[in-house]
């Protein structure tokens, strides 16, 4: 009987140790889940902050470039006007010579 009682105590001791181990595992699992949830929330917060920052940068760049496009258009119009005036001036200065050359070519008879 003594051996029976000893084995009963051993079994009870093992069952108690198994339950304690199960509690430890469950506590560790719960802690891990809590840490994972917290890490996920922190990551989502950082992502949202970064997204907001990048959106603000993009909007600022759009405002700067769209504001500059009006100035660029005006500058290009001025440059184009200046080039047209320059070409007109050059054309006026050589138009007499071109007319004379054309008249000479038309009126000269070649055999």
UniProtKB/Swiss-Prot annotation:
Protein name: V-type proton ATPase subunit G 2
One cellular-component annotation, GO: vacuolar proton-transporting V-type ATPase, V1 domain
Subunit structure: V-ATPase is a heteromultimeric enzyme composed of a peripheral catalytic V1 complex (components A to H) attached to an integral membrane V0 proton pore complex (components: a, c, c', c'' and d).
Species whose genome carries this gene: Nicotiana tabacum (Common tobacco)
Keyword Acyltransferase part of the UniProt annotation: no
Classification via Gene3D superfamilies: 1.20.5.2950
Short name of any one Pfam family annotated for the protein: V-ATPase_G
Keyword tags: Hydrogen ion transport, Ion transport, Transport
Record-linked InterPro entries: V-ATPase_G (IPR005124)
A molecular function GO annotation: proton-transporting ATPase activity, rotational mechanism
Family: Belongs to the V-ATPase G subunit family.
Function field: Catalytic subunit of the peripheral V1 complex of vacuolar ATPase (V-ATPase). V-ATPase is responsible for acidifying a variety of intracellular compartments in eukaryotic cells.
Source organism, top-level taxon: Eukaryota
């Amino acid at each position: 009987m003594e051996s029976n009682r000893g084995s009963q105590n051993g079994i009870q001791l093992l069952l108690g140790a198994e339950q304690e181990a199960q509690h430890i595992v469950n506590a560790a699992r719960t802690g891990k889940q809590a840490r994972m949830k917290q890490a996920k929330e922190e990551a989502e917060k950082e992502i949202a902050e970064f997204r907001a920052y990048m959106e603000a940068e993009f909007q600022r760049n759009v405002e700067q470039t769209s504001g500059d496009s009006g100035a660029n258009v005006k500058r290009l119009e001025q440059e184009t006007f200046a080039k047209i005036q320059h070409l007109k001036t050059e054309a006026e200065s050589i138009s007499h010579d071109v007319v004379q050359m054309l008249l000479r070519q038309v009126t000269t008879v070649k055999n």
